[in-house]
């Protein structure tokens, strides 16, 4: 075990040292085409990841999935699963709801607008999102809707699985992504549940 851990640390160290180092204060430019391709890749990865991982969700807690475990995949599988089990895609449709709010009201839309949009939406929610929906529909608005005193799922991963869209709309702008996370993430999460989302949004950015 110790040897494996040392090898992992060495691999991580070499991979970091091999990355292009950007001097503080310098800028990096990429074309709109490359940026758009990266954003499309992010959305594709998120949607395909939900589909591919769906059948194994909650079945291997505390264990690694055996490499011989068959995982179904065929050309129209993503579309079929979305029709059969749309609740699997809360990662995706919550993000799209938030983007729709920004499209209608601008990127500086208040937290209440994001909260009301998903609270009144006609789709399944789970854990922290569902508890936040209940709170919002009963007059407990953000950030109180995600606070642990009002939301028993405040530490869950709901915002963490939704924060990727924030990074995709804030390319290279980690602080801006964190500002969005502060506003949106506290609608449904608090504490570790919120910090995980801030981290994911920043990594995507």
Locate predicted features.
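Structured, active/binding-site neighborhoods that engage oxygen-rich ligands
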Residues: 21-205
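Bacterial Sec-dependent N-terminal signal peptides
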Residues: 1-22
């Amino acid at each position: 075990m110790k040897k494996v851990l040392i090898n992992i640390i060495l691999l991580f160290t070499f991979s970091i040292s091999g990355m292009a180092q950007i001097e503080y204060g310098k800028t990096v430019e990429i074309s709109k085409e490359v940026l758009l391709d990266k954003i499309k890749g992010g959305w594709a990865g998120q949607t395909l990841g939900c589909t591919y991982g769906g059948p194994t969700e909650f079945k291997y807690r505390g264990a690694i999935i055996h490499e011989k475990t068959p995982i179904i995949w065929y050309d129209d599988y993503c579309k079929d699963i979305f029709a059969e089990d749309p609740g699997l895609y809360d990662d995706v449709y919550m993000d799209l709801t938030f983007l729709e709010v920004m499209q209608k009201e601008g990127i500086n839309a208040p937290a209440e607008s994001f909260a009301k949009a998903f609270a009144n939406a006609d789709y399944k929610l789970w854990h922290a999102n569902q508890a936040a929906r209940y709170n919002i529909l009963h007059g407990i608005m953000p950030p109180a809707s995600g606070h642990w005193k009002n939301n028993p799922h405040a530490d869950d991963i709901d915002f963490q699985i939704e924060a990727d869209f924030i990074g995709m709309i804030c390319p290279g702008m980690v602080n801006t992504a964190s500002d969005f996370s502060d506003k949106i993430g506290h609608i449904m999460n608090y504490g570790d549940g919120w910090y995980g989302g801030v981290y994911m949004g920043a990594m995507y950015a």
